[in-house]
Amino acid sequence: MKKLFITTTMCLAAFMASAQCCENSAYEVKAENAYTNYNVRYASNPQDAKHYTTDRLRKEFAIEKIFAPGEVNWTYTMFDRFLIGGAEPTTAPIKLTSLACLYTDKPTDKKRLLDNRELGIINIGGKGTVTVDGKSYDLDFQEALYVGRADEKNNKEIVLTSKDPANPAKFYMNSACAHQSFPTKKVTL
């Protein structure tokens, strides 16, 4: 009985921690030189989703805001713990920071965005630069960069900049869980 009580209490505490992290659908976290916004989407039961109205489908699945000048916008979905985001640096560089909803066990400032994650970045705007741990990668329109999982030496800091604020880079980003680190690699057409 005591073991059941402890297990139940621990499960409840974990649930409360995740609920506290994600109790509102949108958060605004001040990052260096920009705002990082994110919202959390919970997984939907396929049997329930069949009966959603058009408005409910849009609310559950459409991502309304991906790009905004000087901001990073993320959507964290419980389907595969996937992050979908966009960044549009204008006059100031944008540093990618961790999100509170990714880590409930430690303070966010002790975590990096790519702890246990990998990141793909595609530039769909003007010319821009992605700097990973001090090494710069220039990305033109439709060029991409793969950034592997962070480890003790690599992928600790990611900074995004635009070459021309009048025609800013628009970095579309996807991040998924990763269990192995691979080197950063630029991909061109």
State the predicted function of each range:
Residues F79-S98, T104, T108-G134:
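Glycine- and acidic-residue-biased ligand/ion/polar-headgroup-sensing regions
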Residues V159-L189:
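Surface-exposed beta-loop interaction hotspot
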Residues R149-K156, V187-L189:
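Active-site glycine-rich loop that binds ribose-phosphate moieties when present
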Residues N39-T104:
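Intrinsically disordered, low-complexity, positively charged segments
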Residues V72-N73, K110-K111, N155-K163:
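A generic local secondary-structure boundary/capping motif
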Residues M1-E23:
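Bacterial Sec-dependent N-terminal signal peptides
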Residues D133-D151:
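Short acidic-glycine-tyrosine-enriched beta hairpin
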Residues S18-T36:
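Sec-dependent signal peptide cleavage junction
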